[in-house]
Amino acid sequence: MFHRGEVITVTIDSYAFGGRGIARIPNGDSQFIVFVDNAFPGQTVKAKIDVKRKQHAEAKLIEVITRAACEKVTDFQEISGAPYLFVPIDVQRSMKTSSTLSTFSRISGFQAMESCFDGYIEAPEPYFYRNKMEYSFSSIEHLIESGEEKDGAFALGFKRRGTWWKVENLNRP
């Protein structure tokens, strides 16, 4: 159906443990599943196939084509270390709770997992709260808006996801 390295456009319809969006593609009598890192329900995304198996594929997010209806606009700039920054905290909580409960139910075989669940423990503040921050300096700046790389620049910020040499400059709050 697909091959490794192919770029596809899919609509994410559910969420899996570990921050992966799930897209289902009709394949005869069954469905072919595509797991897309850092995508969530309601988004239409462009993704590159990394791993191809018989019943499923794993893909890396390239671009969000259509945002989900629940996404909100914030004053914060996008950074690769916070892919769910634009998802309201109550939606994040719901996704994480259902993912956790379904994982424990599937592994344990116990179907009434909700009766054992005490609840979601929230962070003191949804924003401006981090357990740890690690900033990097680099002479290679990744420009977030255009996707370009600027060599010979001075950049202070977060490392671009999947790289150790590129930094996304922090120029907004």
Predicted feature residues:
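Accessory RNA-recognition modules of RNA-modification enzymes
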Residues: 1-173
